[in-house]
Amino acid sequence: MSRVCQVTGKRPVTGNNRSHARNATKRRFLPNLQTHRFWVESEKRFVKLRLSAKGMRIIDKKGIDTVLADMRARGENV
């Protein structure tokens, strides 16, 4: 499974580690992904999503039904 948030689309980005001497070595910044089950009352079932902490906050704000409708409009299979 890829390291991509299903709600926000956040994915790993690359950058540099910087030592005290300012030497640069490549590294990846990974999103804070969590797997979470949400109860969808309209469908009477649980939906399991892999999402970032920001994605959870979006669901808290908009509601799971609205977020799922947006995801389905993008063509995501949930």
UniProtKB/Swiss-Prot annotation:
Chain intervals for the UniProt region annotation (Disordered): 1-20
Organism superkingdom: Bacteria
Span of the signal peptide: none
Database matches in NCBIfam families: L28
GO cellular component assignments: cytosolic large ribosomal subunit
Family to which the UniProt record says this protein belongs: Belongs to the bacterial ribosomal protein bL28 family.
GO biological process: translation
HAMAP family per the UniProt record, alphabetical: Ribosomal_bL28
Residue spans crossing the bilayer: none
InterPro entries reported for this sequence: Ribosomal_bL28, Ribosomal_bL28/bL31-like_sf, Ribosomal_bL28_bact-type, Ribosomal_bL28_sf
Keyword list, A-Z: Ribonucleoprotein, Ribosomal protein
GO molecular function: structural constituent of ribosome
Name this polypeptide is given: Large ribosomal subunit protein bL28
